[in-house]
Amino acid sequence: MIGQITSGLFGGHDDSKKVKGTVVMMNKNVLDFTDLASSLTGKIFDVLGQKVSFQLISSVQGDPTNGLQGKHSNPAYLENSLFTLTPLTAGSETAFGVTFDWNEEFGVPGAFIIKNMHITEFFLKSLTLEDVPNHGKVHFVCNSWVYPSLNYKSDRIFFANQPYLPSETPELLRKYRENELLTLRGDGTGKREAWDRIYDYDIYNDLGNPDQGKENVRTTLGGSAEYPYPRRGRTGRPPTRTDPKVKSRIPLILSLDIYVPRDERFGHLKMSDFLTYALKSIVQFILPELHALFDGTPNEFDSFEDVLRLYEGGIKLPQGPLFKALTAAIPLEMIRELLRTDGEGILRFPTPLVIKDSKTAWRTDEEFAREMLAGVNPIIISRLQEFPPKSKLDPEAYGNQNSTITAEHIEDKLDGLTVDEAMNNNKLFILNHHDVIIPYLRRINTTITKTYASRTLLFLQDNGSLKPLAIELSLPHPDGDQFGVTSKVYTPTDQGVESSIWQLAKAYVAVNDTGVHQLISHWLNTHAVIEPFVIATNRQLSVLHPIHKLLYPHFRDTMNINASARQILVNAGGVLESTVFQSKFAMEMSAVVYKDWVFPDQALPADLVKRGVAVEDSSSPHGVRLLIEDYPYAVDGLEIWSAIKSWVTDYCSFYYGSDEEILKDNELQAWWKELREVGHGDKKNEPWWPEMKTPQELIDSCTTIIWIASALHAAVNFGQYPYAGYLPNRPTVSRRFMPEPGTPEYEELKRNPDKAFLKTITAQLQTLLGVSLVEILSRHTTDEIYLGQRESPEWTKDKEPLAAFDRFGKKLTDIEKQIIQRNGDNILTNRSGPVNAPYTLLFPTSEGGLTGKGIPNSVSI
């Protein structure tokens, strides 16, 4: 929009020795309202003038006094503001004129230096030179905070939007390119400040706080064979007093100030809309007040009607100064809405999709199984390839962990087939959480959690839906781990107390699946594993590098969301520990699972084949054939995957035509080396890493990176509230074991099965916290940028990549139409299921809010 308007304003020039340009800035208070004391208002903009200078750098005329680097133009200064744009996102962009002295020898500028002599920072969007003699328009995409020059050790430099491989960079710009990368890497020392732009690595040694006692000590993750982990961004905070190997934590009230490189901080809407304020509000304000309110009443839901009142009526609270003060302390409209005391409930949540059409369909076996294919965690189910299922745990440490499910348990439900026949016909599947949970289960069950490790067998019916056959629940042997487990197998029934037992068995499976989803599928496999790619890309690939331009949108907000998560979500005593069954062992468990993480297996086709739910088939459109044809996540996902890969192939092929061009790209090779040896350094010796010697290896790797950051994260994140917002469907904790005959709990189960169910799963206060959390995590901010979209339409000057990106966007639009068509096909029973919840988690676009659809470019929430 800015470019179109400025073209009209500066289409020509009267003086051949002058070049006019347009600078676009954004109000600081719009972007970062939390720092009101130093907000840069429109009035301050009006007096910037001589306090902000610009110097163009020639790409063709050298400066003999500066090592033959590109010559600098005379400084030019901001002129009066031209106009203000207020986009739908409410960010106020202001455009200024700027006029540069010019001579023909200077030629085409390839970069510019900006100096801010003002007292505070501003956000620089772009600089556009409208009519450079013999060249035309030159556009600089900036999107960066510019602090006062005294804060920097080197000049702030921005490059034009023409990409260059390192070997093709104009000679006069090479030193500037190299020096900018050195600036971004830093020297690995010192505490990072708010204005720093340094990207560096550290291990997860900041989750606990030993200074606050033993209960706040947590295992350091990363840097060891026992607890390997992807690296996080380094903050340089000092160590704790108690343990010099553990980094100190900032106070909760200063959570917004946790360091990430300045341009990685949330933008205006997200900073005001989401994580730290929202979660601090819930944890610090709502939960203690609810504790006070509920002290005199049991911490239980007495019936499913009680649970439904969270959505239909809310929890009523009396008016009073306490809650008026509480409301005033929270600046977020989203959270204020939760705190209404005008006759509506303090915690009145939107009705989750899973109970919107029917209040009971979630309890059916069909829906229980369908959500393994189309729910919030559709990436675990695998084809059963040996019976009974065998454990991969070390028998010397854990004894016999193999399954006790027998043919007698299931053969009456196989439509006349034997177990072997069903397996040979690809009809048997398993949801297997046994091996992940068993090593920690004895310790987990010393907390308030009382749960099992589960295996669930399922049968693929002729109509394409899955039917549960049996659930095995296992506990560590009471005499010690070396004696294996004690297990019990439950099978479906709808008669008497046994039907209530079966419902509880499914609930224990859901507890397992919810914890594994939140910790492994979501946090580890998207948030944690992608952060090293963000860091390495900024440290080793210049902004001029085509691969930096390709990947940059897919890293937006990731470091900020992860830093905030370390501060209040995954830390000792944080929200995650307070809501999932793994409790204080949660993050340590994820490190053990990371041992089996394989980068090439994160590619969707490879993942489907590895889990046995697809086979390689060159005649199939995506190179694999699904063995469950109506598998919504896989069907939609393969189309998204193929669209991404086609786009990446077109893009990379434009810049790399041979293996030699890959090998001689020193930035690309340094990037990949650092990713393997530092970012994912605990796995640097794994044989499966691509060697980055061919264009195909680059294409495959970039496709996988983009898939993880965009579609995979969308699939496991934005369905949280639609499916887990109703806690009985996906409880996070179980608080007592399966009732045994002859016990009071068993008699209660016979007498009041619903109450017994609710007393077993997540307690009332945990439910309120958990539902609040997943509602926030499931929302899109209104400034979200989705797959197939870019923040700036002029992100590159190269026309062929722009055309390829346009084709990518059109392909995604076609995929949206196909998803709508599939969701309307009644034959595809897994698309909506008994709860009538159409699968839209991989629908590419969305509006803001709680939509259950939309694929953001990045792991941004």
Swiss-Prot record:
One of its GO terms (molecular function) is metal ion binding. Residues 33-160 form the PLAT domain. It comes from the Eukaryota. Its EC number is 1.13.11.58. Fe cation binds at H522, H527, H713, N717, I861. InterPro entries: LipOase, LipOase_C, LipOase_C_sf, LipOase_CS, LipOase_Fe_BS, LipOase_plant, Lipoxy_PLAT/LH2, Lipoxygenase_dom_3. Its cofactor is Fe cation. Residues 220-245 are annotated as: Disordered. Residues 163-861 form the Lipoxygenase domain. Signal peptide: none annotated. GO terms for cellular component: cytoplasm. GO terms for biological process: fatty acid biosynthetic process; lipid oxidation; oxylipin biosynthetic process. It is an enzyme of class 1 (oxidoreductase). Its main location: cytoplasm. Pathway: Lipid metabolism; oxylipin biosynthesis. Binds 1 Fe cation per subunit. Iron is tightly bound. CDD domains: PLAT_LH2. Plant lipoxygenases may be involved in a number of diverse aspects of plant physiology including growth and development, pest resistance, and senescence or responses to wounding. Catalyzes the hydroperoxidation of lipids containing a cis,cis-1,4-pentadiene structure. This is Probable linoleate 9S-lipoxygenase 8.
